[in-house]
């Protein structure tokens, strides 16, 4: 049965395999407990092979079926977001990266904030972009990422007409640059 499972995983037909195992009463319990892992691993394999359309579909199925509470929700969310981004389906990517940025304890937080901020900016959704640049500034792990966030805040503030924020952010950027030169 393990060999059969592997074939179904590699051919991206995990739903057929799960339906088959449910017809076998003896292993029905085992299939139910491993369904989370099988659905994820199948979608992850598609992602790793660069089949982003199939990966996005499989990961979305996983997220809908098992999250919150699934074993792989955070990584699945990241792979789904990245798949949509690579497919240039930016609205879906924004949705997935936003959901990822809302997850606590997230090792992908910086990338999620950068992606949502930049994609929103490109769509001229400056308030959304501003929000994610501000979040990026809070979680930045390096001074260069903090500077990127501040530049984003400056641009968004300019576009929404928030002169106070423009002045404050520009002053902060100048202070950071003068410290860097020292």
Segment roles from a protein language model:
Residues 1-182:
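Acidic, polar-rich low-complexity tracts and alpha-helical solenoid repeat scaffolds
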């Amino acid at each position: 049965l393990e060999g059969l499972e592997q074939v179904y995983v590699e051919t991206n037909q995990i739903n057929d395999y799960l339906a088959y195992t449910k017809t076998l009463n003896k292993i029905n319990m085992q299939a139910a407990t491993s369904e989370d892992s099988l659905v994820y691993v199948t979608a992850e394999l598609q992602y790793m092979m660069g089949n982003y359309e199939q990966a996005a579909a499989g990961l979305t199925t996983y997220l809908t079926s098992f999250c919150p509470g699934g074993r792989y929700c955070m990584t699945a969310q990241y792979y789904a977001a990245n798949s949509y981004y690579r497919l240039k389906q930016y609205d879906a990517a924004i949705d997935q990266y936003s959901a990822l940025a809302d997850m606590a304890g997230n090792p992908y937080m910086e990338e999620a904030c950068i992606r949502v901020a930049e994609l929103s900016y490109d769509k001229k959704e400056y308030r959304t972009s501003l929000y994610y640049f501000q979040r990026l500034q809070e979680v930045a792990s390096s001074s260069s990422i903090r500077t990127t966030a501040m530049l984003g805040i400056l641009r968004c503030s300019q576009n929404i007409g928030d002169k106070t924020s423009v002045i404050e952010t520009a002053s902060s950027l100048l202070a950071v640059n003068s410290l860097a030169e020292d």
